Amino acid sequence: MIHESAKQKSKSYFDSHRKSRLAHGGYWRHDYRYQLEEIGRIMPERLIDIGCGPGAFLCLVEETYPGIQLNALDISPEMVRETRERLSDTAVATVGDSEHMPLEGEQYQVVTCNMSIHHYPHPQDALNEMYRILKPGGALLLNDMDCAAPIRAVANWVFPRLPGGDVRMYNREEIERMVRKAGFQSVRYRKISPFSFQCVAKK
């Protein structure tokens, strides 16, 4: 019940914050350049952003690499609507649960997930799904919060009390373990700011 309530809180919060600076990635745009660099090395035909919010990251992908077929998934219908309005007509944005994606397997060369996994009650299920929808040889580009242990402990106490559906902040060992358990290989984890990380892994 607690987990389902976290999902509902997340959906309701982001539905009502469609135009906010936070929803548009204002606090985390610094991290996007690292994700864009990895995309540039791969140059996939198809990419999907999981937990896309209002499409701020995908707008940058579209501007930087206009030839990529862009796809998006978010649990919030309002965020999906915003994404559809901001991207070109060729982009596909879907309402769906990251832990149970309404998507066929082995479709994408790249799966991105930016500042979203800390909202998932069952992150292992979400990572398993990301692995499933990736083509063999495809890449996961995961970006989320990474803070010192005392800050993380406080955050994990506060998160369930916040309105946004935040569930848990994970440390490096937890992220690497879950990513590998999903089946990914060549896992690379690095700090990209005092408060965030990037994890790149291959299927």
Predicted stretch roles:
Residues 24-25, 141-182, 187-199:
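C-terminal alpha-helical "lid/dimerization" subdomain adjacent to the S-adenosyl-L-methionine
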Residues 118-119:
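A short His-aromatic
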Residues 124-136:
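A short glycine-rich, Lys/Arg-flanked "PGG" loop and its adjoining helix->strand segment in the class I
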Residues 48, 54-100:
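Class I SAM-dependent methyltransferase SAM/SAH-binding core
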Residues 1-42, 56-60, 79:
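Conserved class I S-adenosyl-L-methionine
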Residues 112:
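A conserved beta-strand element that flanks and buttresses the S-adenosyl-L-methionine
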